[in-house]
Amino acid sequence: MNTFSQVWVFSDTPSRLPELMNGAQALANQINTFVLNDADGTQAIQLGANHVWKLSGKPDERMIEDYAGVMADTIRQHGADGLVLLPNTRRGKLLAAKLGYRLNAAVSNDASAVSVQDGKATVKHMVYGGLAIGEERIATPYAVLTISSGTFDAAQPDASRTGETHTVEWQAPAVAITRTATQARQSNSVDLDKARLVVSVGRGIGSKENIALAEQLCKAIGAELACSRPVAENEKWMEHERYVGISNLMLKPELYLAVGISGQIQHMVGANASQTIFAINKDKNAPIFQYADYGIVGDAVKILPALTVALAR
């Protein structure tokens, strides 16, 4: 048996749902999708869901992860085994841990390939900081996986599809995290997975202010702006959602222009599937040049304005 009887899908990020649904279609005979509202339910059915389970009734101060209990109960009630697919976002991984505990299931994060052999999931993902690919065969009846961006192509919606909709009512968990306050985050929403051209900056750009030079290049050529993990996580110069690498975005653009990025394996795992890689770095021995199809050795602060003028013509 090379498919599961059922797969359960949930995405806290709407843009990640189409690829998860495409993976679900390849891995199971019946697709169940948990959603948070009617609009997401309609999208899920158009993407191939046979059954949509609308999570309802959560108090505003409670977290989405607190639905884990009723989600696990629903999964158990509809089969003695199954596959759960989640995005490898922060919330996806937290929810995976909670579901794994409640389903007594193995959990595998950041999966880059998934197959089914004899009714069991076989998962591949990066190990040792991206230096190797590990393969795991999950033996538990339920398997909970968080999927790396780009693992599956996006499913295409079909408005003629039909499915059944059910409601899953909120049940307060015995131990819960209560949200006491929220703080709006300034973020320009962008779907980097679909970008044809990407300009990505590393700490070699020098300062947060210098990122404006990369933004000007993006405007000139119609590219989207991304970054390395240190720029987002260490320096806090850009949003977490924009960093490329093993534990976040895995991109496949036509052009990936790396500016001031050294080229460590953890980053290149997320960019190496690009059709063309162009690197700008002042260190001629930077590892990025081993991956680049084209490269310029020099100061990005001086090169970017000249490149912007040349490409804007």
Curated annotation (Swiss-Prot):
GO function terms (MF aspect): electron transfer activity; flavin adenine dinucleotide binding
Organism superkingdom: Bacteria
GO terms, biological process: carnitine metabolic process; fatty acid beta-oxidation using acyl-CoA dehydrogenase
Keyword terms, alphabetized: Electron transport, FAD, Flavoprotein, Transport
Residues that bind FAD: 255-283
Family that this chain belongs to: Belongs to the ETF alpha-subunit/FixB family.
NCBIfam families named among the record's database cross-references: PRK03363.1
The protein's name: Protein FixB
Organism: Escherichia coli O1:K1 / APEC
